[in-house]
Amino acid sequence: MLTSGVSMIFSTLNKNWIVDDTPHLFEGVIDDPSKFATWKEVEHCLNFPCFYDIQFIHKVKSGTFDIPKYPRAWARDSEDPEELFNIWKEGHGLIINNFDRGFKEKQKILGEVEKAFHGVTAMHVYAGLMETQSFHIHEDFTSNFIVQVEGETLWDSV
C-alpha cells in the first residue's frame, strides 16, 4: 500500500529511528494521498464522534477549546454531530485522533508503517475548510509521519 518510493527512501536512510529524531521532508513519494484520508471518511467521523477523539483548533486563537459532550446509552459520552458540523462550518481547524478506528484500509497502512519503523502507530487527521490556523510549532513526544493529502502548508527540511 505504501509506494515503492517510500520503501526505497526508508531503506536508504541509515539511521536508528528510535533515537535519531532529525526531521526529513520527502515530496511526491505517495502515489495516492487519498488512501490516507478522504472527505467522506472525515464526514463519517463527525457523524459518529463516539468512536473518535475529535477536537477543534480555534480559528483565531490557535488553541483547542472544549466541546460539550452528552451521555449516550451504549457508548461513551460524545459530542452532538450537528454541533460538530456547525463548529466545522464556522472555520475552526479539525483534529480527529485515532482516525484509523473502523477503517480496515487505514489499519493496513499503519501495519506497513509499523513494520518499517518497528513501533506502534496511530493515524490522526488535521483539516480545515477554509484558511484556518494550525497549532503553534511544537515538539511531540512521539515521532510523526505526516502525509499532506491536499492544500498548502510550507514544510521545511533540516
Predicted regions span which residues?
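Active-site region of the double-stranded beta-helix
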Residues: 2-18, 31-35, 43-44, 48-50, ...
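Short amphipathic
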Residues: 24-31
